[in-house]
């Protein structure tokens, strides 16, 4: 098919399209819709390898071809079995040769018949495409209508002159790549097709086309002004503008006569009910003509930046949110309202109040839902040119990164994308910040896009993180940017910015704490800085959901999820798309629980122990704490409930602190904790939802004393007989046999009741299956050989004292071709009850990278599945990732402890345990330890690429860890903070284990 190559012409972005307008779908004056969806299962589709091979007759009204299959619209053709799925984290998937794209440019040819009534034919008819990737040509009844691109922004075509009464034929040719592909190198799967709705709109000859709504407030918020302006119209309509209160009562109306250039009005509202994310109250604006009605829900609110602080309704506000893609594991970019409502409902229940639409406008009705549900939105343009970083050459990074934004040829295309973003969503109250795009360097093209935005909409601040890459030497005017934005800074970087007297703009973390796999860790360290600092607008976790694609089930019934490279595509970024707080199917990761409690609406601190007095910090921005939550408490001593009840919540204004008294003060010398739980009040939208908790230590024992049971204590107990050889020490008595391997430095056999309790010799653990956030440092771990370390025992000795057997050993741990990284001395005591106490001390060679873990591993028979532990649960927990958990006694199973990440990795450990049991194994530490039990070895988790490939072992692997290093977010963020690393030079550890009779 011969096409005019608009798709390779940077001077032609849209042909035959209407000027962009705000999003709405009009109604008739009788309340019925003036539009209808052309979406459905009745489109015909054929996939072509390139434009040249397209049958040019497919656009004709009467064309029929049995090879064209039925296709659902909206959908992505890759999700329907055509082409292949391709994940790229930012690299261009075609050669960099703008504006050109490969000749082998796959195409989807669509056609659909639809009827137009005589009544509709008397009106102006428009086709509204909400989203098509990447570029598309449109024909109606065989006549060319136009062309457009910018995948995630709408395109509207006037088809009045092409339409006929009765049957009409719509034909669309979608190209996989255009010159716009160079501007859409976001971190996402690359899908194609008509992936959002197509709507036919019938409008009167005289009608409103575009309008702007703005609200302003008096300083004391007692008066509001509702500004309405007609930006464009056709004909000379008389437009009645009406304002309705949230309860439906009419507050005001005025008629604007366009014939007289009467184009704007201002309504004054006394004692307005203001919109914010905590109370998303909406007014209704109605624009009526003789033949049409447009309805717009509007929240009264005002955004400003003053003295380096972002204010909403004259109050400091904190945006604690997520980055969100439109993403479905089965349908790609195509998401339904029900799908999005599920996302928003989950977010709301998890204390999330803000969303960055990364890195493109989400579905056009998305912001309407955010208005209703209460979210602050950073609305981002469909723009990222990350792929220029892969170009070959010696240019400075700021030149390479900014190659496109500094190229005049791309100027209009970049500004166009921001215009489409802003104009579509300008009337949506939830949008509080505009974003120019993502990771594209900095230069004149973006500067002009920012300046246009500031001029067009001076009521909202403008964001762009990529100005970071703008040193002297290029045009570096950042006056169009209202905040300093950073991705994954260290806590120290944030503190440094705040301490700099020249830092006058507010600070925002548009991406932080990478939620990939088992993560994120280190949230609390950031929030300790973010929450109290008014100059920090907020922070957005990367990201909301995993983007794995669902590919059915294995023969044994396991779900199969694929990621980058699983389709043979190149280039790809592997499982880097698996970085969400929720799985692709929206099951929560433990990271979501972690983020939820980290941003809980209340924070408690202990003020006095007797009487028990607790300070409550109301972290909400607009709600008195007494109106928001019910506070209940429980006090537990080592897992045993001492008391519980509710607390009368005092009146505490937003951002302020107050005090509560707990009516009981326990007298105890054991581990005792107060847990406060915050539940949403019944009159709130989240009625009954638990919004978070605090746990406060009232008393914590310093150290357990691990004392072996001797003859003096139990004179009637049988003593151990000792058999010593060059290889082993064998301890025996009736029905019991314990064998110590003098070469391994651990016990190889523990027989009790004539049954071996361990399936393999014990071993020292120095490696874990790397988490995604270990991806960088795990290379160092492998270089150090932690994954293949062996023990060298230099000497052992055995003695008996008062019935207690003591085995002394001196040994090191090293890997092939490397010197030892650990030199240790151990004393193993076996007492008369069969309890084994390990006392270990030694040194770590700090020339090596920090250890992922250090501990003792046991393998138990596979029927030992019941688990009890006293430590941080119920979720997996680590030194920097335990805010979702609390200290308690938990009863669970090995299977329930396993966190089934799509990309297998370290999981399911529990931090700060006093004791733990698996089956009849019982372990207790002198100091708290980390504990884990799993059907999978770290080797199995390390070697398999997908969870459906995992094969459970014939036993249960138990890890009793002196420590595990923290989780962090180093897959994209900074290196794990040193305080969470195992790199102390001196190691001292004491732990006891025993096997009881029975389970």
Walk through the language-model features, giving the residues of each.
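Accessory carbohydrate-binding/adhesion or oligomerization-edge regions at the termini
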Residues: 1-89, 173, 246, 527, ...
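Beta-strand/loop-rich accessory regions of lumenal/periplasmic or secreted enzymes
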Residues: 79, 131, 176, 276, ...
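Catalytic cores of secreted or luminal carbohydrate-active enzymes
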Residues: 187-207, 556-608, 612-615, 619-627, ...
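Extended acidic/polar, glycine-enriched regions
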Residues: 164-167, 231-304, 675-715
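Extended substrate-binding grooves/exosites of carbohydrate-active enzymes
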Residues: 1-31, 182, 292-615, 619-627, ...
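Beta-strand-rich binding/interaction modules
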Residues: 140, 222-256, 613-648, 658-661, ...
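An acidic-aromatic loop/edge-strand motif
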Residues: 8, 76-79, 84, 91-98, ...
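Accessory beta-strand-rich segments of carbohydrate-active enzymes
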Residues: 1-21, 28-29, 44-48, 68, ...
């Amino acid at each position: 098919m011969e096409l005019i190559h608009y798709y390779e012409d940077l001077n032609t972005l849209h042909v035959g399209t209407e000027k962009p307008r705000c999003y709405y779908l009009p109604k008739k004056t009788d309340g019925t819709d003036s539009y209808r969806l052309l979406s459905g299962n009745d489109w015909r589709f054929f996939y072509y390898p390139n434009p040249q091979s397209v049958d040019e007759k497919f656009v004709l009204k009467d064309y029929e071809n049995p090879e064209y299959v039925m296709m659902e619209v909206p959908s992505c053709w890759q999700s329907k079995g055509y082409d292949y799925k391709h994940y790229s984290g930012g690299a261009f998937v075609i050669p960099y040769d703008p504006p050109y794209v490969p000749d082998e440019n796959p195409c989807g040819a669509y056609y659909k018949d639809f009827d137009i009534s005589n009544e509709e034919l008397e009106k102006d008819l428009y086709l509204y495409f909400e989203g098509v990737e990447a570029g598309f040509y449109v024909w109606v009844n065989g006549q060319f209508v136009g062309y457009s691109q910018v995948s995630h922004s709408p395109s509207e075509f006037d088809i009045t002159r092409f339409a006929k009464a009765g049957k009409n034929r719509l034909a669309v040719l979608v190209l996989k790549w255009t010159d716009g592909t160079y501007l859409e190198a976001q971190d996402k799967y690359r899908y194609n097709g008509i992936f959002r709705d197509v709507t036919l709109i019938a409008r009167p000859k005289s009608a409103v086309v575009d309008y702007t709504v703005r609200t302003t407030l008096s300083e004391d918020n007692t008066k509001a002004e509702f500004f309405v302006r007609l930006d464009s119209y056709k004909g000379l309509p008389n437009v009645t503008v009406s304002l309705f209160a949230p309860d439906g009562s009419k507050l005001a109306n005025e008629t604007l006569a366009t014939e007289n250039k009467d184009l704007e009005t201002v309504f004054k509202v006394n004692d307005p009910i203001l919109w914010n994310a905590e109370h998303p109250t909406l007014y209704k604006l109605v624009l009526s003509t003789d033949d049409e009605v447009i309805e717009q829900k509007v929240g009264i609110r005002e955004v400003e930046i003053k003295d380096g602080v972002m204010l909403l309704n004259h109050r400091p506000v904190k945006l604690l949110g997520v980055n969100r893609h439109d993403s479905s594991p089965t349908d790609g970019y195509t998401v339904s309202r029900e799908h999005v409502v599920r996302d928003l409902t989950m977010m709301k229940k998890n204390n999330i109040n803000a969303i960055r639409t990364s890195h493109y406008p989400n579905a056009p009705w998305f912001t309407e839902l955010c208005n209703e549900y209460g979210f602050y939105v950073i609305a981002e343009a469909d723009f990222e040119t990350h792929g220029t970083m892969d170009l070959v050459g010696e240019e400075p990074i700021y030149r390479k990164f900014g190659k496109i934004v500094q190229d005049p040829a791309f100027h209009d295309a970049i500004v166009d994308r921001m215009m489409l973003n802003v104009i579509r969503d300008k009337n949506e109250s939830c949008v509080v910040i505009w974003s120019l795009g993502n990771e594209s360097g900095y230069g004149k093209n973006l500067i002009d896009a920012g300046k246009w935005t500031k001029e067009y909409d001076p009521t909202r601040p403008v964001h762009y993180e990529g100005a970071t890459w703008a040193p002297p030497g290029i045009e570096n005017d950042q006056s169009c940017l209202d905040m300093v934005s950073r991705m994954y800074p260290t806590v120290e970087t944030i503190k440094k910015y705040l301490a700099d007297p020249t830092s006058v703009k507010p600070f925002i973390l548009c991406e932080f704490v990478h939620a990939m796999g088992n993560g994120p860790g280190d949230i609390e360290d950031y929030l300790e800085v973010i929450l109290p600092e008014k100059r920090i607008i907020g922070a957005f976790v990367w990201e909301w959901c995993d983007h794995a694609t669902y590919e059915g089930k294995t023969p044994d019934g396991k779900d199969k999820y694929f990621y980058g490279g699983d389709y043979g595509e190149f280039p790809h970024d592997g499982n880097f798309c698996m970085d969400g707080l929720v799985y692709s199917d929206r099951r929560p990761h433990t990271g979501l629980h972690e983020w939820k409690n980290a941003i809980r609406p209340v924070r408690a601190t202990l003020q006095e122990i007797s009487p028990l007095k607790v300070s409550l910090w109301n972290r909400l921005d607009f709600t008195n704490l007494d109106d928001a939550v019910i506070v209940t408490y429980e006090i537990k001593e080592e897992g045993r409930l001492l008391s519980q009840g509710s607390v009368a919540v005092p009146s505490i204004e937003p951002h302020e602190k107050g005090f509560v008294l707990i009516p009981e003060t326990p007298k105890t010398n054991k581990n005792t904790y107060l847990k406060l739980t915050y539940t949403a009040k019944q009159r709130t939208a989240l009625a009954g939802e638990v919004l978070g908790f605090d746990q406060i230590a009232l008393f914590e024992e310093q150290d357990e004393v691990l004392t072996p049971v001797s003859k003096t204590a139990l004179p009637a107990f049988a003593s151990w007989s000792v058999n010593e050889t060059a290889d082993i020490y064998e301890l025996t008595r009736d029905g019991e046999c314990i064998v110590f391997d003098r070469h391994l430095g651990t016990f190889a056999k523990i027989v009790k009741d004539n049954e071996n309790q361990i399936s393999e010799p014990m071993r020292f653990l120095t490696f874990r299956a790397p988490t995604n956030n270990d991806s960088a440092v795990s290379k160092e771990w492998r270089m150090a050989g932690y994954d293949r370390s062996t023990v060298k025992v230099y000497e052992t000795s055995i003695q008996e004292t008062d019935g207690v057997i003591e085995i002394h050993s001196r040994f090191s741990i090293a890997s092939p071709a490397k010197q030892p990284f650990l030199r240790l001395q151990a004393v193993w005591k076996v007492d008369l009850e069969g309890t084994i106490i390990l006392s270990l001390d030694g040194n770590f060679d700090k020339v090596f990278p920090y250890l992922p873990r250090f501990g003792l591993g046991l393998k138990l028979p596979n029927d030992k599945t019941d688990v009890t532990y006293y430590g941080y649960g119920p979720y997996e927990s680590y030194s920097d990732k335990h805010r979702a958990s609390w200290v308690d006694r938990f009863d669970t199973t090995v299977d329930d402890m396993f966190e089934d990440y799509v990309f297998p990795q370290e999981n399911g450990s529990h931090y700060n345990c006093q004791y733990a049991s698996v089956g009849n194994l019982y372990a207790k530490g002198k100091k708290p330890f980390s504990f884990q039990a799993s059907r999978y070895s770290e080797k199995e988790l390390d070697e398999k690429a997908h969870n459906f490939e995992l094969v459970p072992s014939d036993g249960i692997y138990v890890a009793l860890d002196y420590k595990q290093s923290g989780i962090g977010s180093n897959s994209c963020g900074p290196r794990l903070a040193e305080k969470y690393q195992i790199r102390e030079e001196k190691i001292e550890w004491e732990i006891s284990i025993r096997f009881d009779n029975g389970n």
